[in-house]
Amino acid sequence: MANIERFYTKFHPTSYQIKLAISRETKEIKGTTTITGEALSSQIDIHQKDLQIEELRVDGTAGDFTVDQAAEAIHVKLPRIGTVTLEIKYTTKLTDTMMGIYPSYYEVNGETKQLVGTQFETTFARQAFPCVDEPEAKATFDLAIKFDEHPGEVVLSNMPETKVEDGYHYFERTVKMSTYLIAFAFGDLQSKQTKTKSGVQVGVFATKAHQPQELDFALDIAKRAIEFYEDFYQTPYPLPHSWQLALPDFSAGAMENWGLVTYREAYLLLDPKNTTLRTKQVVATVIAHELAHQWFGDLVTMQWWDDLWLNESFANMMEYVAVDALEPDWQIWELFQNSEAGAALQRDATDGVQSVHVQVNDPAEIDALFDGAIVYAKGARMLVMVRALIGDVALRQGLQKYFASHQYGNATGNDLWQALGEAANMPIGDIMHTWLDQPGYPVVTAQVENGDLVLEQQQFFIGEGQAQQRQWQIPLNGNYAEVPALLQTKTLNLGNYQDLRDRNQQPFRLNVGNSSHFIVRYDQRLLDDILADWEQLTAIDQLQLLQDLRLLAEGKQISYAEIVPLLPRFAKTDSALVTEMLYRVANDLKKFVAPQSSAEKQLKKFFGELSQAPAQRLGWQAAPGETNDDQLMRPMVLKAALYAENPAVTAQAHQLFEENEAQLPKLPAAIRSLVIRNEVEHFGSPELFARLLKEYQRTSDASYKSDLCQALTATPSLPLIQQLVQQFENAQVIKPQDLRAWFRGVLANPQGQGPAWNWIRDEWQWLEDTVGGDMEFATYITVIAGIFQTPTHLAEFKAFFEPKLATPGLTREITMDIKVIETRVALIETERDAVQAAVAQAIK
């Protein structure tokens, strides 16, 4: 395993002057980079990747250097230490990997066009210009770009443009910043712009394949988010502008480049006349996440990648804080509970999972750090826990001090805890180290022993696990006055239970509000007490009850069969939050039945009973003045009713398709994917399939594209599935950025499992060549592990991936995913009969 050598230890750059001449036609790039900095050694190293170095001068004299492609480095011998200026001339090419400098392709009126953009996080700035490509190596940047320019085209960067000279567009010098946050783009763009109260210019940019009104929502959210953060952080936005740019080809979801934030089109643009509340929520949280980074990540940056959580966890929490302030009616924390909290609790219960704060031993491991369920979701839950513990006043005071102390510099997690701890007068660091530096989380067992109410913590596992006597300082958030704020010991006796119950006059509960990262296992007496009064619980507390029971069943601490009879009572809810968790649990039952079996017929009947009343109440059409919950619930219950083969719901979907066949994009966005999928599954033909696939290629509406992908991958026709799989490597049909969704859709289809699994094994090298530099590459393995559930597939998975265990960046993912499948296979074997019997009993 190659250890990472930190180039910053020998050379501290202070400024860069970068001139780039780029041709879209030939894909050639000619560059000159001048770096001034402080050499601490006579032998320094500069990062480069795939650059052809033509000349390197040191203080104006020909330099002594060697290029080391394996180390992605230029080794430079200097005549002396101290201040030095390097001038490096080089050539390279536009990449085709969505990393470095690369073209995006799109169509306007049948004409293919190119928009060139960049993606430099984590270590791809070195593909664009020689640099010390490490977060700590902050410097200023003077950028000039020349390209094969056509009239009306726009060029953007982190800072405003100052002049055009000899075809080069010059930009204002940046503030001191990290290389991975540099960005630029050029092409035929449209924009809408406004200003914040403090005078920051805010703009949204997109290709002209989109309607102008698709930019409006993002512009409004971006402007108000910046204003919110300036107030919340008590720290001004530090740049003259904040551009939001939608790129047609983009491997990540979005990227927080300072002053020029880049996004997938699906996460920035939406049609205000036909969208869903959930789409608005997702787009708003993505924008708020990236803009939170402009302070937390950009102004103050982690010192090294092992503190990546410091950037991502904080932005993940703040996106919800901001959107909740901007759109309080949305109840956005409910989205956090169902997406972030659930993902973190599931992933973090597998033995071998990374901790939030994790060491990086190999350069290839940096991208593998971006584990959404841990670094983003669990980390955000840790910070939500801190916020609940110290309150917003101390949080804001601490952040203001943190930004003032470290602005334009770097920081570690300890710096943040120190600032927050001083503001709150609490030992935040001591509490948080137990959560950030060790993986996993506890289950707190609450039981009545010899008349006393006793709490006990132990590490919770889904599957086999080595507990290692880990212990946490747990914010208990109990609803009895006698419960301390923190559980700091393994066990705690709260005293006589009946006395406690009589005094408090309510069922005993822990983690009220579900803001702490643990689950609770109540003994039967305590659980029955809660369930007897379950309708009095808030929606979040009902979700938590279902969520904890589900996880306990996944961990074999209780049986899924015990949960089945509870589900019908939760089906009566009017809460979208509870409904979403209800169907999460109900969908988990599908693994216990074989497709087309008599057991699945019974499960479908159970789904029918769960969804019958709400589907009838909500119907396919939105009612005037209906609640946000009704809007969000409609697709959930209709999807369940379609799985149940509810004849009325299926017929209504077919009728809606026929009535709107000539204008499918105009179907209400909330139900469109269900209507089209139902048609493909039950009334499809090769002609319809071909037509929808053509529509997928033609449309620039990301939401409609997603709907078509979901529908087409659900076809029951094996020949049509095989046609789809043949298009996986055809970027004219399926862009590499979208391939994972298509692969997952086909693999999840019982008819498609064989073709998709064969394809990825046969074409693994192609996949690695195409998206191997992408931080999402390893998630193809996660997708497979999320679906496979038979001993045969487990054996095939191990046979294919175990030889790849030594691949840096894949080791942890493969190891964990083998455990995930093993655990699921064992759970099905143990629980199948009991679950099927419970379902049969529930529908009698």
How would you name each of these model-derived features?
Residues I53, F171, V204-G465, S598-E609, ...:
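Hydrophobic alpha-helical and helix-loop surface patches within well-folded domains
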Residues M1-P240, A266, D271, D362, ...:
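Acidic/His-enriched low-complexity segments
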Residues E72-I74, W258, R672-S673:
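Short glycine-rich loop/turn motifs
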